[in-house]
């Protein structure tokens, strides 16, 4: 593990991310086993300006159905799910943080997007 990876793991790795998301979904009246990609927006857009920024980037990149997109630093996979669902593209998503990749995979499966998104830890 490099120094950068160790710093990222220390900062992000020990938080009970999945449990917090499941609790928040239940509180919002959403079944955590079957959320839509939109149900996850309040929790999975970890970058500044959230879903608005994701939309703007997708529009500026002119992402079209059938395209293949690489998301580097996917976090919980929110932008990947947005791009796959709203733009109709396939996404390869990568991140350094094992727990984020785990949550991204669980959310991808729960939102029935497993065939459209491949998520890996690098």
Describe each region flagged by the PLM.
Residues 21, 54, 80:
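Generic structural marker for isolated residues within well-ordered, non-membrane alpha-helices
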